[in-house]
Amino acid sequence: MSALRCSVCSAPLHPDGRSLRCVRRHSFDLAKQGYVNLLRAGVDAGTADTSEMAAARADFLATGRYAPLVDVLARVVEASGEPEFVVDAGAGTGYYLAGVLDRVASAWGLALDVSAPALRRAAKAHPRIGAVVWNLWEPWPVADGVADVVLDVFAPRNTAEFHRVLRPGGLLAVATPGAGHLRELVTELGLLDIAGDKTDRIAESLGDHFEPVDVDTASHTAELDADEVRKLVLMGPNAHHLHRGGLGAKLDALTGATEVTFEFDVSVLRRKE
Ligand SMILES: C[S@@+](CC[C@H](N)C(=O)[O-])C[C@H]1O[C@@H](n2cnc3c(N)ncnc32)[C@H](O)[C@@H]1O
Ligand SMILES: [Zn+2]
């Protein structure tokens, strides 16, 4: 709570019954599901994950297939010293932030995401998570220099705000899909090419504000049953394109197991002064 700022006037926010309020009496309702919406304006349709995508994401992540990425992120947070506050930008259902907080008992976490259905889940994912609906492209409703670590897992990157909310010397971890991520499904199902920016491109784009510390890659393969493949596809951007190339029909027709490659790159950067 002490890290949050009013999205109208930037004053600190305080709990007041079922809302958060600043000294100028700007007020934001706490949803009964445990998150707060600080947005003042709407966001473009199609930006936020839908409740179907959030449900598919929660179900798929519960299989543990992406657990190696939690390990990498937790190691980054542990390496930051004795972290007290971790911000997850585009936290989705809170899976990664909750996994990190399980490992780092000293820290509290803030989940920022524009998707209310995803944040309902994030708010319940861990007792030390606070969840705020926000558009990452706007200045964040977060005080200067309060975060020990910012996580960004497959989410939009706002360099200026990463820098502003991090303390001096704080760490930024940017996770992106590696070159081989889900390559079997890209071939067999014709998925959108989900490969993220190359890590040198990420370091370059953040270079004015951050110096690169490390790039960690985690990769493994697993046999997925048809139901897991469906969830994996429906939790991401392909969910918006089920008619393209008959993707929906291909998913319906799936039976048996598919070998799938998972590959994650995590760029670790340190905030420059
Ligand atoms: C691919 S998902 C990743 C979610 C989570 N980090 C994970 O890996 O499970 C991208 C997330 O970014 C969120 N998102 C997209 N654009 C956003 C924006 N402008 N502001 C805030 N969140 C945004 C979506 O709602 C979604 O939860
Ligand atoms: Zn205010």
Regions found by a protein language model. Give the residues of each.
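Conserved Class I S-adenosyl-L-methionine
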Residues: D216-E273
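Class I SAM-dependent methyltransferase Rossmann-like catalytic core
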Residues: G46-V72
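A short SAM/SAH-binding and catalytic strip from SAM-dependent methyltransferases
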Residues: A147-E161, T176
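A short glycine-rich, Lys/Arg-flanked "PGG" loop and its adjoining helix->strand segment in the class I
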Residues: T159-L171
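N-terminal auxiliary segments of SAM/dcSAM-dependent transferases
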Residues: M1-T47
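Class I SAM-dependent methyltransferase SAM/SAH-binding core
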Residues: F85-V87, G92-P139
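A short acidic, Gly/Pro-enriched loop at the edge of an enzyme's catalytic core
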Residues: E138-V149
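Conserved class I S-adenosyl-L-methionine
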Residues: L171-R201
